[in-house]
Amino acid sequence: MEEEAEEESGLGRSAAPKDFHFYHMDLYDSEDRLQLFPGDSSRIRREVTQAEDDRELGDEFVDEHRLGTLGYPSYGMRRRDPGREPRDWGEAAEAEDLGYGGGQGPLDQCQDLREAYRYTHGRASEEYECYVIPEEEDEEEPADVFCITCKTPVRTVEKDFDTHKEHEVTPISKALEHAKDEVHKNMCKLEQQIIEMENFASHLEEVFITVEENFGRQEQNFECHYNGILETLAQKYEEKIQALGEKKREKLEALYGQLVSCGENLDACRELMETVEEMCHEEKVEFLKDAVAMTDRLGKFLKTKTDVELSAQPEFEDQTLDFSDVEQLMDAINTIPAPSAPVINPQAPNSATGSSVRVCWSLYSDDTVESYQLSYRPVQDSSSGKDRAEFTMMVKETYCSVTNLEPNTQYEFWVIAQNRTGPSPCSEHAVYMTAPSPPSIKTEAIRSCEEAVLICWESGNLNPVDSYTVELIQAETPEASGVTESVVGIPTCESLIQLQPRHSYTIYVRALNVGGTSARSEPATVHTTGSYFQLNKDTCHPWLTISEDGFTVVRSEKKSFRKELPPSKTQFTRCVAVMGNLIPVRGRHYWEVEVAEHLDYTVGVACEDVPKQEDLGANSLSWCMRHTFVSKRHRYEFLHNKMTPDIRITVAPRKIGVLLDYENAKLSFFNVDIAQHLYTFSCQLHQFVHPCFSLEKSGCLKICNGISMPKHVTFF
């Protein structure tokens, strides 16, 4: 009955091995377990636990060779997918498909595996049966703050305890970001150090190569010098030996000659001795006969002086060896050779001022130089025929700023390198040029309108310059203060520049050449309010006088010239008039003329090539308003090509406004005081025109320009 009950209670796990036991659920909190796992959950949990244990054992004993050495039968096993692991010990067929082989059932296999596990781990069967797989505990809450004092991550709930209560903490994300920044900084430093070390290693390699090159060069230098010294010594040895041999030959020849002479004398003495001995054996009579002759012969022989002194001494004079040239060669042997010729660089842009230039040169890297000798002289035309003075200066660097020069002048430079071995060859000559002198703006020639300005200047340099630059500074608005606009590449001494209307500008001019830029010229101020112009004194009739400010024309009461003035293309000779210089800009130009009520005058415009021998308005190149006062009556004429309309003006104007409108091809006159329109010419202006003024009688008129256009004029 008990076995049947066990079979009924163990439904679903009847195939489990008999020696495999589980602890009863009574070991745990049964009430809690019942609440968490209602129903048959305890049975299911035991099955899952047993299946996991089987999988663990199967993984551990997958090595067939190891199992064989232990004396246990090997099992061909493979890792099984946990999702496909059998849930019931009774599913034997499914277990066979999952990898159990050898003809054994799952119960026998599991039992053998457990026996092997107990054997290899040194456990008894009872000890194995006490093994319990604990339940997985819930994961702890991750740390979300970082204790800066302890330098460890903690949870928020722990920072209120005694351990971290007084410590400084920060959010874990912020600490992580800070740590990443520190790591990044250290990595950057490390990368920089790596780069520096790589550069240093490259530099060391270059130094190694340089050492080898210098060694080879010095070795070649020593070999060359010492070979020269040996050749010199060998030559001197040959010369001395040859001279000594000559002296030896001379001595031997002298001694040999003396030896021959001595032998001859000795033979003569012996002959005389033999002759005397023979005479002594002769008879007395014969002896006396021969004795007289022999006596004379002996007397003559004895009178002959025999030189017994040596003609040549065997000793040789001590020879003084002159090694001065060898010493010079020895002194010339240095560790460094004489430098090569320097290479003088071309002039760099903007490297000069009006009185100085910066000269640069380079030298071969393997040359050692102690100083440089820089020489220069001005470049002049060959036609001048004057000797050019040369100047020399010693410098230590490979550059030099030469001062006290003439502006906008070319100079020829060359350089020599020197060290203790000697000077180098001279470099090639290079031409440098000083910057120009600052130009001078002709303030009296400035012409402007609301849209542009025409400025002229004098170069201030004897030699031509490459170009000019005009600098403009707008001086009215605070936000534009100090902002400089430049117009560059101006080839001539004048420029027409577009500007903004109703502003004030400060203008400077600079001159440029290959050497650099000159200093700024003196400033000139320009206002783009109305049209501003000056009177052209070259066109002024001799009877007229222009005031110092250039805006008042005066005709004094003087007698006329008896002789007529010769014709001129620029100066008025018949009409007592003068022209103004209006800026050549097609637009609207306005100016005013103040006149006396009874003054005879003519105002208007005319082309530049208007005939100077004709009255204004008497040709097709001039448009004028003429006023004459006759018999207490005012007469006004608007003349063009000697024609005038019939117009009567009741109010004599004291200030006449003139509006020149190129766009609409009109020339209008106004009475400024009463804002009255007087007359308008409709004229086709194919060329630029200029204001013109004439006085028929003595008096003066004043020109007002550079003023804003009145409102009543803007409607025309």
Swiss-Prot record:
<protein>
    <recommendedName>
        <fullName>Fibronectin type III and SPRY domain-containing protein 2</fullName>
    </recommendedName>
</protein>
<comment type="subunit">
    <text>Interacts with CMYA5. In cardiac muscles, identified in a complex composed of FSD2, CMYA5 and RYR2.</text>
</comment>
<keyword id="KW-0703">Sarcoplasmic reticulum</keyword>
<feature type="coiled-coil region">
    <location>
        <begin position="229"/>
        <end position="284"/>
    </location>
</feature>
<dbReference type="InterPro" id="IPR003879">
    <property type="entry name" value="Butyrophylin_SPRY"/>
</dbReference>
<dbReference type="InterPro" id="IPR013783">
    <property type="entry name" value="Ig-like_fold"/>
</dbReference>
<dbReference type="InterPro" id="IPR043136">
    <property type="entry name" value="B30.2/SPRY_sf"/>
</dbReference>
<feature type="domain" description="Fibronectin type-III 2">
    <location>
        <begin position="438"/>
        <end position="531"/>
    </location>
</feature>
<dbReference type="InterPro" id="IPR013320">
    <property type="entry name" value="ConA-like_dom_sf"/>
</dbReference>
<dbReference type="InterPro" id="IPR036116">
    <property type="entry name" value="FN3_sf"/>
</dbReference>
<dbReference type="GO" id="GO:0016529">
    <property type="term" value="C:sarcoplasmic reticulum"/>
</dbReference>
<feature type="domain" description="Fibronectin type-III 1">
    <location>
        <begin position="342"/>
        <end position="437"/>
    </location>
</feature>
<dbReference type="InterPro" id="IPR003877">
    <property type="entry name" value="SPRY_dom"/>
</dbReference>
<keyword id="KW-0175">Coiled coil</keyword>
<dbReference type="Pfam" id="PF00622">
    <property type="entry name" value="SPRY"/>
</dbReference>
<keyword id="KW-0677">Repeat</keyword>
<dbReference type="Pfam" id="PF00041">
    <property type="entry name" value="fn3"/>
</dbReference>
<keyword id="KW-0963">Cytoplasm</keyword>
<dbReference type="InterPro" id="IPR003961">
    <property type="entry name" value="FN3_dom"/>
</dbReference>
<dbReference type="InterPro" id="IPR001870">
    <property type="entry name" value="B30.2/SPRY"/>
</dbReference>
<dbReference type="GO" id="GO:0005634">
    <property type="term" value="C:nucleus"/>
</dbReference>
<dbReference type="GO" id="GO:0048471">
    <property type="term" value="C:perinuclear region of cytoplasm"/>
</dbReference>
<dbReference type="InterPro" id="IPR050617">
    <property type="entry name" value="E3_ligase_FN3/SPRY"/>
</dbReference>
<keyword id="KW-0539">Nucleus</keyword>
<feature type="domain" description="B30.2/SPRY">
    <location>
        <begin position="513"/>
        <end position="711"/>
    </location>
</feature>
